[in-house]
């Protein structure tokens, strides 16, 4: 296990006068204790963990809810606010009643060393964050316990690089892995390995790097490994779809190879493999995203004016199991109308997926959407109706991350709420 000096953990106070404050809880039947904890939001559970050692023991022994899914039925939402000079991280707990939901802000202990960051991914309640200023720092972070770990730097560094990340957990190996795909121009100062196409720099060289974390991780074993050259050129964004222990990416079309591909990276055997695509028009013509909805791999295909279709792969890896489950029409939230001088300009980049993001399916069957990084909207597929979600304290500009609350760390069992 990595040493205590390697990462920061919150301290737990001792019981006052040696008397167990949690004695009252311990005397209750286990089913009652489990029922009590299941009704509490993760933010409340996190606070109780640090009241005293007795309460922490009770929560650890009786409050555990095992889950193998990275998409919880009652997720909380993390809102990454890209404010000038210093970024912020807020959260909304969707397990509370809608009228009582308030946006809360996390205190980031690493803010001085990494004031601006991107969220690489969320898995089992742990976040992987990357330095958006210098691209040389990565952190593992649990926002509810404030545990954090700065990951080591890669031995191989390149100038003028483009990065694609992935972060996930494999249920069989019980290992977390951080995937880093580097596209670069080469070590020389000339133009070898680089060319311009359609006004954009294209990098011809690449390297795939990976780092593993588990209960067996030590300071000596915590290091990056090279997997060689990347077999594909992916769209520059982190993987948002972790399904079946695999990260999923979309390839970038090339001049002579316009066909986009779906590619998975298996966190167990560390191999890239192509995934069959649905038989629908527009996949090669427009941009699209892969997301995880209720444990299924889904493809969001964008059309004009914010319209989109959601295709679901019901049986993983089987092409014939793809089916179009949802079609969502054009909608302009009131919040966007009030903040835009010319509201119709919003649809300019709609086909590139820069207007609407599909986040998750809610318990009531509604689809949670994010519009232009400013407004959250719930869409009812049965009624075909949209509802703007207005929460107190919502930042003016944010990137939403669907998150499963946990009190665990990378070297401990999962405790998901």
Swiss-Prot record:
Gene3D superfamilies: 1.20.1280.50. One of its GO terms (cellular component) is plasmodesma. Pfam families: Beta-prop_KIB1-4, F-box. Residues 22-68 form the F-box domain. One of its GO terms (biological process) is positive regulation of cell population proliferation. It comes from the Eukaryota. NCBIfam families: F_box_assoc_1. PANTHER family: BNACNNG10540D PROTEIN, F-BOX DOMAIN-CONTAINING PROTEIN. This is F-box protein At3g07870.
């Amino acid at each position: 296990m990595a040493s205590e000096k390697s990462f920061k953990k919150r301290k737990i106070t001792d019981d006052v006068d040696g008397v167990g404050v949690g004695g009252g809880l311990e005397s209750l039947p286990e089913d009652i204790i489990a029922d009590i904890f299941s009704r509490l939001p993760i933010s409340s559970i996190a606070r109780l963990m640090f009241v005293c050692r007795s309460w922490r023991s009770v929560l650890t022994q009786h409050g555990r809810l095992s889950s193998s899914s990275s998409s919880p039925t009652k997720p909380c939402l993390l809102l990454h606010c890209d404010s000038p000079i210093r970024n912020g991280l807020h959260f909304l707990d969707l397990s509370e009643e809608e009228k009582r939901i308030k946006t809360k802000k996390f205190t980031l202990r690493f803010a001085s060393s990494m004031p601006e960051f991107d969220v690489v991914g969320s898995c089992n309640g742990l976040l992987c964050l990357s330095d958006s200023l210098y691209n040389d720092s990565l952190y593992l972070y649990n926002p509810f316990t404030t545990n954090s770990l700065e990951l080591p730097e890669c031995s191989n560094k390149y100038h003028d690089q483009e990065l694609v990340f992935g972060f996930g957990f494999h249920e069989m190996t019980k290992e977390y892995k951080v995937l880093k795909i580097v596209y670069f121009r080469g070590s020389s100062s000339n133009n070898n390995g680089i060319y311009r196409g359609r006004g954009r720099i294209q990098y011809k060289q690449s390297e795939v790097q990976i780092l593993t974390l588990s209960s067996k991780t030590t300071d000596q074993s915590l290091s990056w490994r090279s997997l060689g050259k990347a077999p594909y050129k992916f769209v520059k964004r982190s993987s948002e779809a972790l399904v079946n222990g695999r990260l999923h990416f979309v390839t970038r079309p090339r001049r002579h190879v316009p066909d986009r591909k779906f590619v998975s990276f298996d966190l167990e055997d560390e191999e890239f493999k192509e995934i069959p695509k649905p038989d629908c028009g527009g996949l090669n013509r427009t941009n699209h995203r892969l997301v995880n909805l209720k444990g299924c791999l889904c493809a969001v295909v964008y059309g004009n004016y914010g319209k989109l279709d959601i295709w679901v792969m019901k049986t993983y890896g089987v092409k014939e199991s793809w089916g179009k489950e949802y079609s969502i029409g054009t909608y302009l939230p009131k919040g966007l109308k009030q903040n835009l001088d010319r509201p119709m300009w919003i649809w300019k980049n709609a086909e590139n997926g820069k207007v609407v993001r599909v986040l998750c399916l809610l318990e009531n069957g509604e689809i949670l959407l994010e519009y232009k990084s400013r407004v959250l909207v719930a869409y009812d597929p049965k009624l075909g109706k949209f509802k703007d979600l207005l929460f107190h304290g919502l930042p003016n500009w944010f990137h939403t991350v669907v998150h499963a609350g946990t009190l665990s760390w990378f070297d401990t069992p999962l405790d998901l709420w």
